[in-house]
Amino acid sequence: MTDEMKAKREKLFSSPKNGYDLVDQAALDAMETYCESYKQYLDNGKTERECAAYTVELAQAQGYVPYQRGMSLKPGDKVYRVNRGKSVMLAKIGRQDLSHGAQIVASHIDSPRLDFKPHPLYEDSDFAYGKTHYYGGIRKYQWVAVPLELRGVVVLRDGTVVKVVLGQGSEPKFVITDLLPHLGAEQGKKPLNEAIPGENLNILMGSRPLGQEGDSDRVKLRVMDLLHEKYGICEDDFTSAELEVVPAFNATDLGLDRSLIGAYGHDDRVCGYAALKGLFDIDVPEKTAVCMLADKEEVGSMGVTGMQSAFFDTFMEDLCQSQGVSLRVCYESSFCLSSDVTAAYDPNFAEVYEKRNESRVNYGLGICKYTGARGKSGSSDADAETVAYVRRVLDNAGVVWQIGEMGKIDAGGGGTVAQYMANRNITTIDAGVPVLSMHSPFETVGKLDCYMNYLGCMAVYNA
């Protein structure tokens, strides 16, 4: 090949590169530091309530204060508001007023899990169980025969909130039992999504009886007695509880080269933390920078703590009113990075990917012009001008990025909060970290992509 042809190819062809070929040692050192703090965020927030509480703890350490309606705000002020303990909005006030819009990064901090039912505890064949109702798009077979924790809150009749954490550290764990292969012939003939029925996702909570032989529900009684001893609760209190069953392992490096992170909850805390840390680490921005950490994305962003809630609008309107600005004027000049994970190309399951248009681990922040399913159903399809804007912002900041879709057209699909931000007349596009084994109890991401996500969030805030 002549030098002329080589130069022409380099100029005209797209040539994605592994991010490790594009960064220097200083960036790699910064990447490791960032990822260590991210792993701490994961371990401190295995539920949306825990994430919200830890977010507030970190924000207060950075000088953020609760926003009070009517506060006078000046450039550089740092405020936050918590919505019912499950979602958080933070803002760093910019030099320009909100008539020029805001630079928003929106993520979510809920993850697929198992929720306790209102009447969860029962005994069968001298075992005590807790019945669950799965939350979000899980693959049920992945949740059996793995160690589990129970986390959440019980709200007593008088309104007292009791925090529950069972299975942490060296504490005893829980498990959902599976069928042994010796007796699994019929189960093995079933499709994966039918092999473990939802009603069989019952966690094993104990087997030792309390009381005299011949008494009923002796194992259940011991479990309930232990819960009462530790937390002061009785069985009726489960009706006003939010108890979540989550995997009982912490975030860890993966691979001999430690280039990956394995953990529960990368979707979407990997983007939520990047949005948060990016906000912390910018100076006073030109436009007000807003970080939204929402709840309920995994079930459609519904409800008072989801992205469809008026909570976001109320917070933004309060900020606008403090500057005498119309909310709608602010929205039409704003930009939102819907920061949610995307599917990473997995060569073990190549048949469901369209390789030319997939995000890959270690190739940087993954932009998705549109998500949805099949004919882009349920997606927010960003226009070409928005994609060009994001390209420019990321390139100017030296962020390694890529663009792709989520699998083959008819293989499935997914959605994010992007459509709900776009419905508010806010220019919006999706971008996030490629994830392997998404929605499983133990997801995998690349450290380089995590770091580029963080740099990308900072670039958006500063744009």
Where are each of the predicted segments found?
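N-terminal hydrophobic/helix-forming segments and targeting peptides
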Residues: 1-463
